[in-house]
């Protein structure tokens, strides 16, 4: 079973103004597999990241759920944070929410948090793999763009195969 840590961010007042952060922490800390849950004003800050790293080490966390603002803004931040603490960077889930009504927003936050916890329970670490690469290209289409692409690739020293569905190459240019 995973040992999951839940980290709920206030995002200053952005989240805390519309979500009862304490209620979210209380609801999520009793979920199966959760061994640590806390909240902090800015999880993306250096001190917030240290809270995450310290908890991973202290509690032996195998996965984390970060309830914060948009993954678009901070996914890389949190991925690096958990990796720096020795956790696989893909063993984390991030959820965010938007609502005006505090009760609805809090309910949604709890549901999203539970969903993220369930997902982390099932996660398996991703590992790097290498595959042999054949340095050869296939160009589909024998029009002028396909021909030029094939020539450019060949000029760069790679083998090229070009396929065309018609019996001749040149596309519309051959009709001029």
Q: Language model features by range: what are they?
A:
Residues 1-176:
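Residues forming the flavin
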């Amino acid at each position: 079973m995973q040992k999951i840590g839940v980290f709920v961010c206030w995002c200053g007042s952005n989240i805390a103004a519309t979500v009862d952060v304490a209620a979210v922490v209380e609801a999520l800390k009793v979920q199966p597999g959760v061994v640590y849950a806390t909240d902090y004003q800015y999880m993306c800050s250096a001190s917030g990241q240290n809270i995450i790293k310290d908890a991973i080490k202290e509690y032996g966390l195998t996965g984390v759920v970060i309830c914060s603002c948009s993954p678009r803004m901070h996914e890389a931040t949190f991925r690096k944070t958990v990796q720096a603490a020795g956790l696989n960077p893909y063993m984390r889930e991030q959820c965010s929410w938007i609502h005006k009504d505090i009760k609805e927003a809090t309910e949604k936050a709890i549901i999203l948090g539970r969903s993220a916890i369930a997902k982390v329970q099932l996660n398996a670490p991703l590992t790097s793999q290498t595959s042999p690469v054949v340095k050869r290209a296939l160009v589909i289409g024998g029009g002028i763009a396909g021909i030029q692409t094939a020539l450019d690739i060949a000029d760069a020293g790679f083998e090229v195969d070009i396929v065309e569905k018609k019996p001749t190459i040149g596309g519309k240019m051959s009709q001029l």
